[in-house]
Amino acid sequence: AALGYAEALTRSSDPNDNRLGGELLRQLVRTDHSNIRVLSMYAFNAFEQQRFGEAVAAWEMMLKLLPANDTRRAVIERSIAQAMQHLSPQESK
């Protein structure tokens, strides 16, 4: 139920809802950092909120969990590259 609520908040047109959804997703990631769906939603929400370092960290966790032949890996790798372009040199280390 919490994941569905977080998803609804992140899709809202209200920036405050988006922020609350991101906080809820962050709590869900802390509780279960092996849930691909939670990590994916968290990463995309962080990216949309311009928290690029958090997005990269979540996507990197996903890559560790996915099998080498998983088709989602290419999309995640592109997303990481895109987020890295937004990071300052200090953040990308």
Language-model features, listed with the residues they occupy:
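Alpha-helical adaptor scaffolds
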Residues: A1-D32, M41
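Short coil/turn and helix-start
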Residues: S13-D17, Q49, T71
